[in-house]
UniProtKB/Swiss-Prot annotation:
Organism for this UniProt entry: Hyperthermus butylicus (strain DSM 5456 / JCM 9403 / PLM1-5)
Residues involved in L-serine binding: 255-257, 309, 409
Entry annotated with the keyword Methyltransferase: no
Domain of life: Archaea
GO molecular function: ATP binding; serine-tRNA ligase activity
Subcellular location: Cytoplasm
Gene transcribed to yield this protein: serS
Record keywords, A-Z: Aminoacyl-tRNA synthetase, ATP-binding, Cytoplasm, Ligase, Nucleotide-binding, Protein biosynthesis
Quaternary state and interactors: Homodimer. The tRNA molecule binds across the dimer.
Annotated positions binding ATP: 286-288, 302, 373-376
Protein name: Serine--tRNA ligase
Amino acid sequence: MTWSILRYLRENPDILKDSMRKRGLDPSVIDEAKRVDEEWRKLKRQVDEIRHRHNVITRQIASARDPEERRKLIEEARRLLAEREELEKKLKALEEERERILLSLPNIVHDSVPVGFSDEENVPIRFWGRPRVYRGHLDAFKAQTERWGFKVDYELIDWKPVGHADMLEYVLKLGNTMKAAEVAGSRFYYLFDDIVWLDFALLLYAIDRLTQKGYRLVLPPYMIRHKILMGVIDMETFKDAIYKVEDEDLYLIATAEHPLAGLYYNEEIMEDELPIKLVGISPCFRKEAGAGNRDLKGIFRVHQFHKVEQFVYAKPEESWDILEELIRNAEELFQGLGLPYRVVNVVSGELGAPAAKKYDLEVWMPAQGKYREMVSASNTTDWQSYRLNIRLVRKKDMKREYVHTLNSTAIASTRTITAILENFQEPDGTVVIPKVLRKYLEIFPKAPKDAIHPVKKVRG
């Protein structure tokens, strides 16, 4: 049972170097890891040889008749034991050094990932829907579609939709970020009435659809310990994004992916139990320290939100097909909502450390004239399972190996609400509620039924 990164280090380190280059990282660390590993393996052979000699002498002592011979054998056994113990200390230090280096490495980039270092280089692989395009955004729309060789049908409109932030706070008057900033700081919000109902309806819609597909519904812990967090993310990259509970070994979760990945921590899973498909629902908490001044208005990029997350434990030979399943599940949800989108293959330099490959689903935002990310789906292969010690047991020979883990957004409620506010906005400011959500609202007397009406009409 060998972790893939350690296997490639020994069998084909050039693959690891190439993967590092694709991410824009220095590949020389691979040479250092290989040097330490070779030194460890050489010393391991010495230790094993000494152990063997010690065992042989121990048996000779048991059968020795001559006292002098027995004394000499005992002295030699003691010398070998002392030598072995000293070498084992060096061996342990080398093993720890090798582990430190290898655990700092990102996952191996899959061959199908395009090489690039900016999200503007992400490669669209398909489009869906008929977006409404404001005349003033037509050139920008074509640059995001035709540049990549796609001819996407669209509806040209002469009125510019109001942006989601202004729709929320001034047209519908169902949100208040200024007061939330006084109470909690920037990127927090108060939502009211119909928008809250819409938030809940989106969550119910996602878990309803996914549980019908056989995904097990999970309400996970909203906090996790450091050792689990270290197993699921690159802490060096994300330390400024995660909220820590003061004086406690606990962190607020940034996504349900993290506690779901810990569900089988330090466990073995029989082959015939896989794949294990989960759908988690939780609040998410993110510092967004690296966001700077991006998306300061509204609820697109915030410190807390609700999310439904897909998570799968899979056999290695099935994980790539399951990645396609996860993104298709998300696409079906957004098709049901009627939100026009594109799926992009994320370039190597924009992958997070755990991901070997990632798809983003981006919805067209008519007021912004851009496709914006709503969903990320990743195959982390054995990057997380090695750290969390989660193994599968093959039925035929009881061989152990590390499972593959995969994750994908199903619905992030606040972002999806921003897309609804812009895409289903009428000229007067009315927001039509997607039909698939209405059955989750109609049972509540106070919930909106088919539309959210403006307090302040925009036009007409």
